[in-house]
């Protein structure tokens, strides 16, 4: 409901003014269901198919990212998260919405989280750039692409990953080359150069968004937790740490599924609260920590990136 933007983030109720503009009333909507609410039991049909019996059905977080954020293995609240996949979503958890001219100007959103929290976040382009390039290439593995990228010259070409040019081009590879030509940069010629351009540009974009996020957050950000499928990309994680200048903790990669399970565990009494739930995930899931390296080099590259973005 909060993602649909019909809910007043402060009152946590449907916004009457918006409903009036749309010719709707609260009677047009069902009751709000919150993460952890028991909504019933399995239907007879599903019981027969699965053999599970009349087990309870528990509402998890509102969608995949919300459940993934529930699985962030943080040991305190001074963290930001990056849900990394086709798209990247970066944010912090807050107790109350942050609504002001700055959040509007920077295009941050306030969405519902678990245990009454708000997810103050921004959507960023992610591995979409590489996935679309791979459509144009012969079958090649991620390890091969990463090795080719590592062997290329650093910061030869950079792009703004959120430029409209990359929304849905006929050829992502050609779109990247066009962007570089239009911005008077060397044009990537090889796969490795394109992949390096994508990863370096994403890392620097993450820094830009994180700096904006820190200016909005009610608490300091001391670590960036990368969750989702992109957390398996060690090279991107290391470059992200280099760019943002704080430790990056990667994992779990299956954060959405783990978050779903843990919300059900909370309802079942197997975990006492979100803090203990996250501590359990931290102890149970292999995590990797990446500390910043070559910070001055990345600071210089960031200044160049800002001229593009």
Where are these regions (language model features)?
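Glycine-rich Rossmann-fold phosphate-binding loop(s) that bind the pyrophosphate
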Residues: 229
